[in-house]
C-alpha cells in the first residue's frame, strides 16, 4: 500500500514546480525538504530570467507553472534585455525580493490542495526489482509512493569552500545529504562532481552609490506571466548599479592565487564555464583591465546588495581587500561572504526524455542533480518531471516536447542525448529554431498543453483561441489587401511617417518595414483596432519576419520527414564518412531501425543524423541507378 502518488525530494525551484504540477493534476503529493523555511530560497543571485532563461520562465508560465507569477508579485526591477535586437533573442529579466519570493513560494506549497509538505531529510531510496517504491528519511520513517522525483539541488554530498576552510553543507547553514548520494551510487547511476559559487553581500549603508553607474528598470515594466495584466502592472522598481574591478583588484587576487581553493586542488568539481569566479576570470583573461560588477538589491528594503560578477571562494580577508579596492565599495561591510560549493550530480544520459531514469523505473530527476545551472533551467525541468510523473500515475501518454516546440524541449534533449561534464546553461544559440521559439509566442506554443493537464484555467485557453482567430484574420487581411500609390494612400503613409510606395504593394510588405509599429498597424483597418495587444504583436512579428519564419517551419517539416527514414537492414555504419568513432560505435551497438530511433540514442547529434540521412539517400540513388 502506498502513502502518496508522487514524492518530491527537495524544495528548491525544481521541486516546487514538480510538486505543484503533480498536486494540481490530482495526484496525492508529498514534498520533503530539509528546512520548510527555505522552500523557494534563491541561493545565488536575486534575479529571475535573462537571455534564453526568460524564454524558459515564459514557457513554465504557459504550461501552468508558478515561477513567472511569483516573480511578477515580488519583482524589484523588470527589463527586456536585447530590446534593440530581433524578437527571437530578447529576454525578460527581473530582480526579485529574495525574502518575499521565498515566503510566497513556501506559502504556495503549504496551501496547494493535494500537496503535503514535511520537514525531513531523505537518506535512502527504497528500490525493489529495478523500481523505486518510496524513500526512507533521517528519522527512520518510510514513505511509499508510485513515483519519486529527486530535485536535490546542490545538497547531494555538498561541500562549501571559503579559503582553505570547508564544511559539509548543501548551502551555508544547511546540512548536505551524504547518504542519499551514496544511495544513488549504489543503484548504479553515473554520479559525477560539479561546482558552483556565489558572491558576497554588502550592507547598503556602507556603499557609495554616487560614484557608480545607475541602471533603472524599463517603463512600462515587462511582466513574465500571461496572467499579469500589463495595464495594471506597476511594481515599485529599484535601480541596480555598476562598478568595476581594476588593476589593484586584480593584483590582490593574483597575489593570493596560492590561497584560492580552485587553484590549490582543494576543489575538484567542474564549475560553470559561462559564470566563472572572479579569480578564474583574472587568471584566464589576463589582458582585461577591468571586469563589470553589478550591484543589485536583494529586497525591497535594500539593506543588502549582491555583487553580481564577483563569485568567489577566496579567504575572507582577500574578499574584503578586493571588494574595498573598487569604486564605491572602499568602506564596504560584508554581511555574507562569497563561497564555492561542490556537489554530486547524475549524468543526464541516464535519463529518458520524460526525465525518468533508464535504470530505475518510476524515479525522476530534475534540476541541478541533472548537471544544469540556474533557477530557470531547474524550474523548467521540475515542471516537466512533475507533469510526466502525474501522467504516468494516471496511465496516460508521456509529455515530451521537441526541439522545435520549446526551449524546454531543447534543454531536455541536450541533457539526455549529450550528457554534460560541466554545469549546463541555456542560451538562445542552443536552439536551432529560435525564431519559432520566441518569448512572445510561448502561450501560443504551450498553453494548450497546460490547459489539457488542468494547470491553466479554461478562461485563459478561450482568450488564447480568440487571439489566434484574430491573428489569422489579420494576416490574411495583410496578405490579400494591397495599397496603390494613389493620392489618398500616399497622404496616409506620409501622415504615419512612412516612405511612399511607387507600385502596388501588399499591406503585409508595408507592415513588415522596420519602422512600422503597433500604433500604425491599428490605423490600417478596424480589424486591428479591435485586436488585443498580444494578438497585434504577433501579427506585426509575423509580418516582419514572414520569410524567415517560413524557412524555419519548412526546416522543421524536413526534419520530421527525415526522422521517418528507415535505416536499411544490415547497414554498415563504419562506411559513413563524417561520423565520429563514438557515434559509429553507438549506432552499431543499438542498430536503430529508423533515423528517429537513432535520434533517441544518447550522444547522437542532429549533425550526425544529417550526415547519416544524406548517406542513406545517396546509397538509395546508387542502388536505383
UniProtKB/Swiss-Prot annotation:
One of its GO terms (biological process) is tRNA wobble uridine modification. InterPro entries: FAD/NAD-bd_sf, GIDA_C_N, MnmG, MnmG-rel, MnmG-rel_CS, MnmG_C, MnmG_C_subdom, MnmG_C_subdom_sf. It comes from the Bacteria. Its cofactor is FAD. Belongs to the MnmG family. PANTHER family: GLUCOSE INHIBITED DIVISION PROTEIN A, PROTEIN MTO1 HOMOLOG, MITOCHONDRIAL. It is found in: Cytoplasm. FAD binds at residues 10-15, 122, 177, 368. NAD(+) binds at residues 271-285. GO terms for molecular function: flavin adenine dinucleotide binding. This is tRNA uridine 5-carboxymethylaminomethyl modification enzyme MnmG. HAMAP family: MnmG_GidA. NAD-binding protein involved in the addition of a carboxymethylaminomethyl (cmnm) group at the wobble position (U34) of certain tRNAs, forming tRNA-cmnm(5)s(2)U34. Homodimer. Heterotetramer of two MnmE and two MnmG subunits. One of its GO terms (cellular component) is cytosol.
